[in-house]
Amino acid sequence: MAPLKTSVSDTIDKIDMSLDDIIKLNKQEQNRKQLKGRYNGSFRQFRNSWGRWGAQHTSGAGNNLRSQGLRKRPYGVKTGLAMRKMASWKGISPLNHQPLVRNSPGQLVSFRKRLNPQRSPDSGVKTSSSLQRYYLRSSSYAPTNTFRSGFRMDQQRETRQATFLSRRGLKVQTLMDMDQHLDLPELSKTPPWRTSVSSGGSLTVSIDNPSAVTLPSSLGSRLPRPPFPFLTKKEGSETKVPKGVPLEFDINSVAKQSGITLNERFKILKEQRLAQAFTKGSRFVTVG
């Protein structure tokens, strides 16, 4: 019966109070009930203190922290080196802050010093002019004849293709450079005699001429090569008469018949047909 007494005493107190005080008391009681429901281990959906609706678990690390009066660390908090740097900026205007660029020149110099402590600081830095001189001296940047180098690359590609096809049993005809002809002893030597394949039975003999001047291999590249196909002019072939359908009548004679009208012309043709029909004795009669 104790709770009844308390409830009666509460009601007596509320009668003496004003309306505003009664509303405040009711709100406080509702808040107490909500807090009891939050911590009784149940799984409920209600509007939490952050103003969002969602399922809330009372058990967990975050809730334990809240019950102890601690707060979770928010995301994006500076820690470690960044926190120390920010602490060193305290009391300094943001306009006077050091740049946050990683590869700043000061950092690079300190990094070089750490790597090479015995080296002088000026020896590691090379100017752009010295680098240009180095690249110009190197053999790879020497000026070359691009036309000839491209021609040789094409030749190398052709020889590679020829070897690839010849290994597979296909006949290949390749054009060799003059330098290669002169370098190969088998091709430069002329046989002492040759037998002809013809049925005449004549024998041709070739004799070495010591007085003949042989070209060295260096001059072989200067020999005139055959001209390129796009530079050679094709011989002008004779203009052919266009073939057409032969005309069965003279168009000039038709044009000259300006005195006869079309009606007269058709009348003459009709009379000719009638005359041919009567002479042949045909059974068909044409009515004019």
UniProtKB/Swiss-Prot annotation:
Q: Where is this protein found? A: Nucleus, Nucleoplasm; Nucleus speckle
Q: Which Pfam families match?
A: FYTT
- Motif, UAP56-binding motif: chain positions: 11-29
**Region described as Disordered: spans on this chain:** 183-202
In its UniProt record, which GO terms are filed under biological process?
Answer: mRNA export from nucleus
This entry carries the following GO cellular component terms, namely: nuclear speck; nucleoplasm
Note whether Endoplasmic reticulum occurs among the keywords: no
- State the UniProt keywords alphabetically: mRNA transport, Nucleus, RNA-binding, Transport
Q: Name one GO molecular function term.
A: mRNA binding
Q: Which domain of life is it from?
A: Eukaryota
Functionally, this protein is described as follows: Required for mRNA export from the nucleus to the cytoplasm. Acts as an adapter that uses the ddx39b/uap56-nfx1 pathway to ensure efficient mRNA export and delivering to the nuclear pore.
So what family is this one in? Belongs to the UIF family.
Q: Under what name is this protein listed?
A: UAP56-interacting factor
